[in-house]
Amino acid sequence: AWASGINLYAAILVLGLLGSSGNMTLPPDLQILTHPVVLMAAGFMYFVEFFADKTPGVDTSWDVLHTFIRIPAGAALAAGAVGDVDPAISLSAALIGGTLTAGVHATKAGGRVLINASPEPFSNWGASLAEDVGVVAGLLTALHYPWIFLGLLVVFLIVMIWLLPRIWRGVRRLTQMIANFFRARRPPGAHGEETEARLPPPQLPEAGKDKNSY
């Protein structure tokens, strides 16, 4: 679920390859990840995401689209990871996994919006490559050193909870700055606004002249 919030297709591809090569025994509900068709689909989508995720602007659109893909997929992977257990446990795992995926996804997407505000493209590429490496390294660590992975995951969650509100405050300020910029450039009378007619100032009666009597 953690990896799904960062790069879903890389997570599926790595898990599928580890399962099909015998380096990892997947739970029965996740054995489908080793199917060649699933591996090819995950590999193709990872290839597309590799370039989309490193293109400023495109990466944000990609993240918005995958809000509706990563979170349900993360919940499904978490439910499948617990194996054949009581349905209540599977549902609980899905809820926790979906929430974790949503938090990671929101942190990634919000951070990318702020990074895209930078005029140079290298920070975008660096962040994307770090995410790719982090997903693979995290899954391998979970496989070989599960307790170390759990400790790192707890640290990651603490940092995410601390960082997420600050990221979205930054996104809100950036959005407000962009809105103010276009509002300042808007010509008078735009969007159907009517300019008020300027009326001449009222004439005061001249001194020394009598008022008309009734």
Per-range role (PLM):
Residues 30-36, 82-90, 109-120, 168-181:
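A cytosolic-side transmembrane-helix exit/cap motif
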Residues 19-36, 77-93, 142-150:
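Helix-coil boundary and interhelical linker segments in multi-pass alpha-helical membrane proteins
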Residues 1-19:
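The first (N-terminal) embedded transmembrane alpha-helix
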